């Protein structure tokens, strides 16, 4: 995964009020990932309300207030669709759901009060797209939920949300991702969604 993919996800959560931590600064290529290396981002919502409901499986910006804390896996396979066959044949998609990874993730967050006031640790998968045709779409969703994924976000949904929030008269010099999007939007190089 390239830094730009993770940068898009980071910007999306930050633009929606989350504190974001990048779990590691390097990419694992020539060996099997250790537990802590399966997590791409760790997100925390400081404005989460204690009595909030559980977020829907499809996360859009309107659902983010219901997320308290989460680990995020980014699968930026932009030319692929997460079909049932692809999901069954790609166990690396679910690597961040292993017990050793979840144990490591719980160590990264502050302790939840004994009264259970903290929200559950969600497992969020960022993916390019799901099949649009039935029964493949439903089968993909069933596989993702059965594996233990709590929510998914598509790159398309994130990019649309970011583009809607970008002002062309602002200078986003602290974010290469937002600055490039602003420039493209300023010169009408992006189609309206």
Segments predicted by a language model, with ranges:
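Intrinsically disordered, low-complexity Ser/Thr/Pro/Gly-rich regulatory segments
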Residues: 1-38, 43-193
């Amino acid at each position: 995964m390239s830094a730009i993919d993770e940068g898009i996800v980071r910007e999306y959560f930050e633009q929606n009020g989350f504190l974001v931590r990048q779990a590691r600064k390097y990419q694992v290529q020539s060996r099997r990932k250790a537990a802590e290396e399966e997590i791409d981002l760790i997100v925390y919502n400081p404005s989460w309300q204690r009595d909030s409901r559980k977020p829907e499986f499809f996360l859009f910006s309107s659902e983010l207030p219901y997320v308290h804390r989460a680990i995020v896996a980014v699968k930026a396979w932009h030319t692929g669709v997460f079909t049932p066959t692809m999901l069954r044949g790609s166990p690396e998609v679910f690597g961040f759901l292993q017990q050793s990874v979840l144990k490591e993730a719980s160590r990264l967050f502050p302790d939840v009060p004994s009264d259970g006031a903290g929200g559950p640790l969600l497992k969020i998968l960022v993916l390019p797209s799901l099949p649009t045709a039935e029964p493949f779409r439903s089968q993909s969703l069933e596989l993702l939920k059965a594996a233990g994924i709590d929510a998914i976000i598509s790159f398309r949904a994130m990019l649309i949300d970011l583009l809607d929030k970008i002002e062309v008269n602002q200078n986003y010099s602290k974010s290469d991702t937002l600055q490039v999007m602003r420039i493209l939007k300023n010169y009408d190089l992006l189609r309206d969604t």
